[in-house]
């Protein structure tokens, strides 16, 4: 019989002494004199690994409306191309890199790269292009160098915004308890959007957009066995590259968005003590705006010396008192202190109060919030868990219509997991908002309608219910259903509540998701969701009027995929999506008759058919066809000169069919 013993084993055996008294536990082995480096496994080195895939796509788009670019990723007609990638690299020394890209080269795409050594450092680089299309506008105002020049010829402009975002970040781990990071981001936004001015009659025009935002974040993270602290700085600077706009016969008729900057210092941390976890944060910030102002008669200011200081603090705790009982709570405080300069305006038409016969100064507005949340969870029995909580929020506003509001909310949730195939979640909450006396704001006008209540400040009762269930009768089927209902009532509980304004609002709907794994080769899914929002409000324009506003939304979708064709090389599939939204407003004036105010209506059909064919283990072809049918109409939009004295950008409604055919080649690493 042959015995094969390596040198390390022989050394361990020789160090044990007499066989009769030996303890062969590895913890007693004496390896001090063993040259372990000479006996390392030469075949145990982990090789460098590349995983992922790279895809190049070439296609053709046929569309008569630029709005289709929101679905296809580009509004370019004709031939389009893009690159997708998801590649990772890892070697034995701990170096890791990752590259991700999606529709790179198209109007909506991104690329992201990460590289570094595990436990030491990481560098990240990101670029993203985001383009959104609204509609095509027609205008007779031409913009150049800050001047809006009227012209007899009509100019067609795409109302679209393009955002180019780039970021660079670096993380360095000094040791296992100390980590540092810094990141810089920049966004450039260009394009056109809808705007309005009076000159002397109302005119809608395509406002040019050319602005940039720079952001910088840096911080240090310290950690221990049961604690962690993050000390960081966050800053941003906004710059508008388009100044005030003028007409040939009137200067500075449209004020530009002012340049501004913001800075924050933050300290956040977490501490764990047995079954209790504490976490909190303190953030101090300052926002500054000191851009030039448009000069008008009676205005003594050349620029606005604006400054707002902010303070945010939060402390939260959660504790497992027993294996069945968990309790938690948080206290949140925020303050917005407006320290902008205060000036006295001597021009009567700007500052004169006809009731008090006095001149006034501009008033700075402050706001302060306190929020307290308490919650608990208790396991009633195996498979039954009850959660409940109380939320309190108080908001104080200076010089507002209502200086103080208080929200009190009680909520509860029952989670049932007793059964193998079905799970239930039942949630309910009830909230009441009250506060100080509601008075007309001195800043807005002391003659304001005393019966008018703004919905975000008025007394309100809110009740909300939600029921969710997950049903899995077999391993090839799963069904999720969620139903919700909420009602906001602005009733007259104290005789000082809403008479004019929003009276009541109901929000209810459902969401249904179905997943089917019919066989190893066949899968399917479907979903449906609907939402209804019904509101009642009243107003006063010569006569009291009442309005019912009904908004409804629906989303339907289904898909199927089958693999295993042509020797398991071919997979085919289809996806369908339908979306519809409808808004109706019915006005009843003095109960003398009802009038439709005008509706908004839109629907969208989207279909995708595709086939994927594996040329080999590392190469794959995909052919996909996508179709979109989109239609919308908005009664609030009118033609350019349909209303005397009003110039619009034309009808922006959509009604189009769009097609995209795309061939993709993928290489799998």
Question: What are the functions of these language-model segments?
Answer:
Residues 1-22:
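Gram-negative bacterial Sec-dependent N-terminal signal peptides
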Residues 22-46, 59-669:
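Gram-negative and organellar
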């Amino acid at each position: 019989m042959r015995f094969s013993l390596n040198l390390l084993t022989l050394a361990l055996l020789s160090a044990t002494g007499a066989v009769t008294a030996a303890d062969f536990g590895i913890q007693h082995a004496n390896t001090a004199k063993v040259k372990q480096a000479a006996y390392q496994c030469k075949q145990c080195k982990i090789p460098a690994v590349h995983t992922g895939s790279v895809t190049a796509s070439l296609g053709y788009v046929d569309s008569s409306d630029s709005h289709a670019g929101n679905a296809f990723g580009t509004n370019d007609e004709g031939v389009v191309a893009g690159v997708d990638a998801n590649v990772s690299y890892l070697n034995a020394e701990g170096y890791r890199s990752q590259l991700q890209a999606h529709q790179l080269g198209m109007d909506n795409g991104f690329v992201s790269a990460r590289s570094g050594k595990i436990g030491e450092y990481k560098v990240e680089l990101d670029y993203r292009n985001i383009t959104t299309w609204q509609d095509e506008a027609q205008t007779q105002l031409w913009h150049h160098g800050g001047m809006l020049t009227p012209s007899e010829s009509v100019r067609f402009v795409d109302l679209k915004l393009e955002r180019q975002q780039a970021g660079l970040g670096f993380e360095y781990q000094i040791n296992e308890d100390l980590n540092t990071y810094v990141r810089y981001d920049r966004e450039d936004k260009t394009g056109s959007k809808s705007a309005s001015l009076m000159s002397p009659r109302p005119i809608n025009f395509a406002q040019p957009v050319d602005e940039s935002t720079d952001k910088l974040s840096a911080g240090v993270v310290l950690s221990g066995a049961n604690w962690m602290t993050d000390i960081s700085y966050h800053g941003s600077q906004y710059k508008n590259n388009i100044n005030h706009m003028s007409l040939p016969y009137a200067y500075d008729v449209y004020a530009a968005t002012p340049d501004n900057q913001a800075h924050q210092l933050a300290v956040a941390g977490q501490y764990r003590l047995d079954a209790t976890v504490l976490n909190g944060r303190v953030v101090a910030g300052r926002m500054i705006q000191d851009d030039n102002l448009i000069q008008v008669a009676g205005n003594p200011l050349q620029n606005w010396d604006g400054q707002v200081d902010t303070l945010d603090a939060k402390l939260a705790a959660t504790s497992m008192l027993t294996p069945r009982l968990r309790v938690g709570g948080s206290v949140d405080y925020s303050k917005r202190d407006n320290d902008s300069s205060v000036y006295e305006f001597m021009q009567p038409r700007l500052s004169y109060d006809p009731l008090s016969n006095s001149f006034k100064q501009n008033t700075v507005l402050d706001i302060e919030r306190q929020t307290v949340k308490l919650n608990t969870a208790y396991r009633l029995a195996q498979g039954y868990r009850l959660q409940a909580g109380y939320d309190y929020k108080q908001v104080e506003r200076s010089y507002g219509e209502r200086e103080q509001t208080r929200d009190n909310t009680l909520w509860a949730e029952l989670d049932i997991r007793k059964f193998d195939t079905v799970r239930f979640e039942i949630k309910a909450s009830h909230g009441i908002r009250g506060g100080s006396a509601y008075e007309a704001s001195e800043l807005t006008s002391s003659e304001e309608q005393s019966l008018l209540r703004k919905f975000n400040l008025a007394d309100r009762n809110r009740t909300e219910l939600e029921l969710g269930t997950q049903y899995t009768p077999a391993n090839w089927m799963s069904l999720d259903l969620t139903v919700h209902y909420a009602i906001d009532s602005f009733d007259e509980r104290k005789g000082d509540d809403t008479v004019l304004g929003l009276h009541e609002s109901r929000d209810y709907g459902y969401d249904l998701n179905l997943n089917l794994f019919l066989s190893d080769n066949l899968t399917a899914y479907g979903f449906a969701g609907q939402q209804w929002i019904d509101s009642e409000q009243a107003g006063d324009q010569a006569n009291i009027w009442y309005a019912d506003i009904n908004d409804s939304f629906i989303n339907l979708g289904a898909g199927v995929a089958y693999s295993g064709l042509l020797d398991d090389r071919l997979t085919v599939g289809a996806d369908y999506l339908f979306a519809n939204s409808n808004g109706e407003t019915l006005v009843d004036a003095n109960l003398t008759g009802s009038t439709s105010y005008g509706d908004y209506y839109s629907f969208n059909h989207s279909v995708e058919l595709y086939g994927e064919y594996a040329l080999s283990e590392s190469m794959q072809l995909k052919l996909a066809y996508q179709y979109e049918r989109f239609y919308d109409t908005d009664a609030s939009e009118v033609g350019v000169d349909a209303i005397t004295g009003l110039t619009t950008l034309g009808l922006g409604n959509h009604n189009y069919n769009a097609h995209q055919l795309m061939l993709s080649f993928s290489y799998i690493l």
